[in-house]
């Protein structure tokens, strides 16, 4: 739902058979405009909240600054790059919803809007020194959808769990690195052990021939 609180908004769209060739929103107003996009999964609740743009922007800026403040300090030469990296990580965090049982970090919110079953390890390492809870969730998130065989899905999102491929088993290495900085509890260590055991056994049972491990596809 696109709700125009101030100004005007006009939809310009051209349809061909079952889909649109393009969709354009022409927005404007004599004194500016303010429109909101509200995601609706089933039925509209008939609620149109009033938003103050400056206040919403301030809350978002405060959330970003709080995230950055907990990241490790960098030398002056690297601060601009570190700020951009922190912003990209922060902006890719999404709330639990649908198939996502915990907070997750997508690869981006541009077009790689998934969590892939090895990229998430690098996300966990990136957050381990400033955001231990997010780092733990990022490292263990694939366990939420681990198959009974031990296999991990190729990727997950709020809407999909995809099994087309598998990814390199770097999760044990990642856990070892995380243990250097994260104060993992006995319960977390037990959860990680069960996860890694099933994952390792899957490789030994289903991806080994003549003593060598193999991939079925280049995307693996």
PLM regions: where:
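Substrate-binding groove/exosite segments of carbohydrate-active enzymes
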Residues: 68-176, 180-181, 189, 197, ...
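Acidic/polar, glycine-enriched structural segments that form the non-catalytic walls/loops
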Residues: 1-113, 186, 193-205
């Amino acid at each position: 739902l696109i709700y125009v609180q101030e100004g005007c908004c006009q939809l310009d769209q051209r349809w061909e058979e079952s889909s649109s060739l393009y969709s354009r929103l022409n927005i404007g107003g004599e004194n500016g405009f303010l429109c909101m996009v509200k995601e609706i999964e089933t039925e509209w609740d008939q609620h149109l909240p009033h938003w103050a743009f400056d206040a919403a922007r301030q809350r978002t800026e405060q959330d970003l600054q709080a995230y950055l403040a907990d990241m490790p300090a960098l030398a002056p030469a690297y601060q601009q790059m570190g700020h951009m990296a922190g912003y990209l990580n922060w902006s890719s965090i999404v709330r639990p919803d649908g198939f996502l049982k915990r907070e997750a970090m997508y690869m981006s919110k541009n077009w790689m809007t998934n969590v892939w079953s090895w990229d998430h390890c690098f996300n966990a390492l990136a957050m381990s020194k400033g955001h231990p809870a997010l780092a733990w969730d990022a490292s263990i998130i694939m366990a939420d959808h681990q198959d009974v065989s031990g296999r991990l899905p190729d990727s997950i999102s709020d809407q999909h769990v995809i099994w087309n491929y598998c990814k390199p088993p770097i999760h044990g290495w990642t856990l070892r690195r995380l243990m250097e900085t994260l104060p993992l509890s006995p319960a977390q260590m037990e959860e990680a052990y069960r996860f890694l055991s099933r994952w390792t056994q899957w490789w030994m049972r289903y991806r080994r021939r003549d003593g060598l491990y193999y991939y079925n596809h280049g995307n693996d």
